[in-house]
């Protein structure tokens, strides 16, 4: 509440002169680009601005002591081309700072950008809530050093861009729903040394264009906090994800959600005892007819407040897909992942396909995870342990999420089903308390299962 009150007072205190400066800021950007490029540097102070469009070869510098605040008038934001087709139809959304078909653009500095997200209607359609930064069809994009606060929707979105660098950025986003941290639908990307604390997904790779490949992307040395998923690929997955490496990151939930308390979501998520939790530490989700291949997530430390450390799903959310092809997932490596606290729910990790769609060549290596146990009846929400594998629904077309099966899974560590080529290598699974499910790992319809140097024996159907 203190943060919300501060934003309200902040907006009320801004002068009309600041609004007049918005036109001057856009004019300076336009003039710099027309003259071949340059740096447009804000002075120190607080500035309320309408939507800003970056142009070729322009760097917007927001120095320390400068605070740029987004207008709450959505009509003052530039329209962006409605140029892509997702399975559910065309999408469009405005952004406070945007660029489209631009080359060599940047937002840098030690200053602050405030999205005023709490002023936009909570839970209204995403089209009615602007993103904070959005780049479409751009080349050579940099976002460095800035602090991004209180977006109304996604914080930083790169769509069909080539050559993206995000370095040393701090993001805090708890003012509205769908407040992702960094959404990557781009190629040749580096994200490093960022601190992200958000309501929705912290780092999320998306593919909303069937003929564009999200590839050659690296995320490293970041600290991620989320009330949703922490490291995610999907759910939007109509194109190709290839050669993605996420490594040397820390994930934990630091901030209790003021919007979604998972203890009371639906009839309650089993075992969740705090408002300070997120869903999956690592979530890999292919459900829209795209392809995911050559993905590694490694050197990850999982701290407190993570409900499910690993969630991997291949499904049929949208079928037929945009291109009429089924989803595929292959060559996945999860390596050197260590939990420093037990999982924050009774929902086990899962690696699942559906009949006819099977993840291929998935390796978990040097993984040590801890689970809470306490799997004694009755479970929250009246749920019971599935007595038979067949009791776990396929949920082929359901939205992929750790809780999607609406049941306590038959194992307390990992439930795996419909997979070709799955290796557990030096995997250690621990219980903080006894669990009546008994088995650490349950495998159903898994071919090519190998278990080496692990502290469990899978229950195999």
Spans of model-derived segments:
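Extracellular/periplasmic carbohydrate-active domains that bind, remodel
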Residues: 17-461
